[in-house]
Amino acid sequence: MQFLDDSLLPENQEKLVITVAPYGPEWEPADFPEDIPVTMEAQVQKAVDCYNAGATVLHLHVRELDGKGSKRLSKFNELIAGVRAAVPDMIIQVGGSISFSPEDDGAAAKWLSDDTRHMLADLDPKPDQVTIAVSTIQMNVMEILSESDVAGTSFNRPAVANAYREMTVPAGPGWVEEHLRRLQKAGIQPHFQLANIAHLETVERMVRRGVYTGPLNLTWVALGGGFDGPSPYNMMEFVRRVPDGACLTLETLMRNVLPVNAMAMAMGLHPRCGIEDTLWGRKGEKMGSVQQIEQLVRIARELGREVASGKEAREIYKIGTSYRDADDTLAHLGWAPNRAHGQRGVPLRRAA
């Protein structure tokens, strides 16, 4: 992404799109009973409260009445329908793992099977987005967590901690390409969750081959444990490599969330918050998803950055848009065109 002399001025930046992940499938309700919704009614109301606070993208997982993460797509359909009726302008982004939480102590923390995750393209009503990983990778979320991060939570139990230490993301090339085909056919926009620059390069290669032809909404996911860590050096190199036509959100864990989000907002990028990412405000003080959104809105106001409405967020994300082919997609995203047969030198960009 390019930064001009006036790129840090808020009047030249996109309006702020706040993503919230308020369902926290990794946590047990007892970890934060004041903020973890369990009933379907409470889960819908949580979306409403987050939208009213200023979040316009809802990262959605679902819980069963016993408090465990739901692996039933019928429950996803029910929650999507409830949220759509209550806050129709909110962008509904379904977490592509469905649920990675272990069933019981000693069970693995794992994503559901390839075929089951493909069924996200058949959700009804359909969401606006489904998140997608583009490479199989270790997802050891325990690696950068401190004792204070997990104090008083289920992550203090060795079996739970070990399950998340050993978690991997299954996303082989064949599955990724088939998943993108199904999502695009269904009119659902993929939201790429990328762990590092290697994953960004994989996305670019898929665009160049015409595997994906649409707007590029990305999240840089700085979790450590196989992913980039939340170092500003990692962040800035990733930002540098993202094409100008993409929309970039930053994500990390626990008390790194606020400083990373503050940098995102100052640079004209977009933040993500919510209890899936952090339970904490100041050290030792829990902060719920709505309060995290309100904090970001306050910071945005101090920066002079306007917060997008639901309809404006849909325009920024280009929900419902697709492009003709690889060349058209490359032009819209600001990547150099594919090399023509026999062409030497650097292919020059053209206007979209």
Predicted regions and their residues:
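N-terminal small/glycine-rich loop or linker at the start of catalytic domains
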Residues: L8-D35, D149-P158, N162
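Structured C-terminal cap/extension of enzyme domains
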Residues: E201, M236-R240, P259-A352
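Catalytic alpha/beta core domains of metabolic enzymes, predominantly
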Residues: Q129-E276, K286-M287, Q291
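Active-site beta->alpha loop and helix N-cap motifs at the rims of alpha/beta catalytic domains
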Residues: E41, F76-P170
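Active-site mouth loops of central-metabolism enzymes
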Residues: P22-Q45, G96-S113, R165-P170, H191, ...
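Conserved, mostly hydrophobic/aromatic
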Residues: Q43, C50, H61, V130, ...
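Alpha-helix-loop-beta-strand connector modules within alpha/beta enzyme cores
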Residues: K68-G96, H179, L183-K185, E237-G245, ...
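Glycine-rich, proline-tolerant flexible connector loops at the mouths of alpha/beta enzymes
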Residues: T56-N77, W220-G224, L279-K283
